[in-house]
Regions:
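Short loop/helix-cap segments at secondary-structure boundaries that form the rim of catalytic
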Residues: 1-2, 95-103, 183-191
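Short beta->alpha connector loops at strand-helix junctions that form conserved
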Residues: 4-16, 93
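Phosphate-binding beta-alpha-beta segment of Rossmann-like dinucleotide-binding domains, i.e.
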Residues: 12-65
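Short gly/ser/thr-rich secondary-structure transition/capping motifs
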Residues: 44-53, 98-106, 126-132, 152-155, ...
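Rossmann-like dinucleotide/phosphate-binding beta-alpha-beta segment
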Residues: 52-143
């Protein structure tokens, strides 16, 4: 800024794709889609005495409490999808009650972890949020709780989460981000019970990547025209 250099960013290009991934993980866990598909291919449905077959709990999302940690673009889009599923939506956010739609209730962080059936992380990584999900907060959660992280890997203490999953302290986790990417072979989440990991692809739909490139081009053209947009160092 002191040297007159304009810095721009590319905002909100992957909002829909990341919110979609939250529910890809959540629906996979709720219905155990991957597991049951694998069991069908092994012949277990063929050998079932009944017209249907399942061997895990099947979870209905309607009426469940989802807690969103952070309510920016992606958090808000996730909230809207959750509302369409008939879920109760709570958020830990700097926004005031007056800034929230009536369907979203504000909650303090520890209360959110204790009261919600699903917790989804949407906050930036700062020194204050680093490893905010740790043994203490995991101990607050319900034994049937689900944790989703499409934000930043270091928001979670991975050993503490693995311990909570392996001990049955919480039911399941779906994560698209890890503290180190690609992960080391000894990352404890790779062998944790009911831990579903995708390789940082929430942002990477074709539509999102096309949008990213288009906004970058728009930023450049606007700068060349003397009317810069998406400036972050005004």
């Amino acid at each position: 800024k002191e040297r007159g250099i304009i810095v721009t960013n590319i905002p909100a290009y992957s909002t829909d794709s990341v919110a979609q991934m939250v529910f890809a993980h959540l629906l996979n866990i709720a219905q155990q889609v991957q597991h049951h598909s694998e069991e069908v291919h092994k012949g277990r449905w063929t050998n079932s005495p009944d017209f249907c077959f399942w061997d895990t709990p099947l979870i209905e999302l309607a009426g469940k409490k989802i807690g969103l940690v952070g309510l920016g673009n992606t958090g808000m889009r996730t909230a809207r999808i959750a509302i369409s599923f008939g879920m109760e939506v709570y958020a830990f956010t700097s926004k005031s009650h007056f800034q929230l739609p009536p369907e979203i209730k504000k909650m303090e962080l520890d209360e959110l972890f204790a009261e919600c059936d699903i917790v989804s992380l949407h906050c930036p990584l700062t020194e204050q949020t680093r490893e905010m999900v740790n043994a203490r907060r995991l101990s607050l959660m319900k034994p049937n709780a689900i944790l989703i992280n499409t934000g930043r890997g270091p928001l979670i203490n991975e050993q503490d989460l693995a311990d909570a999953l392996n001990s049955g302290r919480i039911y399941a986790a779906g994560v698209d981000v890890l503290s180190q990417e690609p992960p080391r072979a000894y990352n404890p989440l790779l062998t944790a019970r009911n831990c579903y990991i995708t390789p940082h692809i929430a942002w990477a739909s074709t539509a999102a990547r096309q949008r990213l490139m288009q906004i970058a081009l728009d930023n450049l053209k606007a700068y060349q025209a003397g009317n810069p947009i998406n400036v972050v160092n005004k």
